[in-house]
Amino acid sequence: MNAEASWIIKFLTRIRDMRVVWDVMGSLYNRAIHDVIAALYDDIARELTVPQKAHVLDVGAGRGYLSLAVAAEHPDAHVIGIDYSIRQVRAAEKYRLQRVVDNCSFERGNAMDLQFPDETFAAAVSVGSIKHWPDSHRGLTEIHRVLKPGSCLIIAETDREATDEALTDFVKRFRLCFVPDRLHFWGLRHVIFGQSFSAEALADAVADAGFRDVKCLRVPTCPYVIVKAWK
C-alpha cells in the first residue's frame, strides 16, 4: 500500500471514531446493521453468565439492540447501556420504550472513564465498540474495575483477519444504498475491519487488562470475533 493510500485510511479512521459522525450518521447505521448481526446479539445474550438480580453493563450500546437482547434473556437483571453519542442514547431509549422493556436503561458515558463505583456490575458486554476507543487498554481496565470478582465479560468486534469471501458476503447483507459495493468493500476492509482486532489481538488485550480464562471464537454468521472472559 502506498503512502497516499495509508494517509487516506488513517484520515478516514479518525473520522470513523468522531462523536459527531455518530450523532449524525448513527441512525442510518442502526437501521443497516441490525438485521445483519441480530443473531450475534442473541447469541451473546444467551452465552452471557448473569447472576440473579444482577446489574449488567453494555459499553458502546448504540441503539440498544444488544442491551435489550440481554434484558430479554435475563428478565430479573437490570441492563445499563452507555454510549458517548447523546443521539444514540436517545435513539436507544426511544427503542426501549417501543419494545416496552422495563429492566434496561441508557445513559451517556465514555469507556475511558466509566462513571460507576468499583465492583458495580456482575456482567458486561460490548459489540463493535472497542475499535473506536482511543485507548483500548484503558477502556478494558475500566470495565474490569467496575465488575465484581467472578463477573463475566463478553466482547465482540469486527475481525481484522476476515477473508475476502466472508467480507464480500457481509457487504451483500450490509447494504448502504448510496455506496457502490466495491467502495463499500474497500472501506470495510481498510477502515472498519482493517483497523480492528484479530481474534488473538482481542484475546490478548482482554487478558492484559486483568481478565482470566479468556476464550476467543470467530462467529459463523458474520465476520466478527467474540471473547468471553472472567474477572
Regions found by a protein language model. Give the residues of each.
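C-terminal lobe and adjacent flexible extensions of AdoMet/dcAdoMet transferase-like proteins
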Residues: 226-231
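C-terminal alpha-helical "lid/dimerization" subdomain adjacent to the S-adenosyl-L-methionine
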Residues: 9, 156-209, 213-219, 223-225
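Class I SAM-dependent methyltransferase SAM/SAH-binding core
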Residues: 55-57, 63-113
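Short glycine-centered segments of the SAM/dcSAM-binding site in methyltransferase folds
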Residues: 55, 151-152
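Conserved class I S-adenosyl-L-methionine
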Residues: 1-50, 65-69
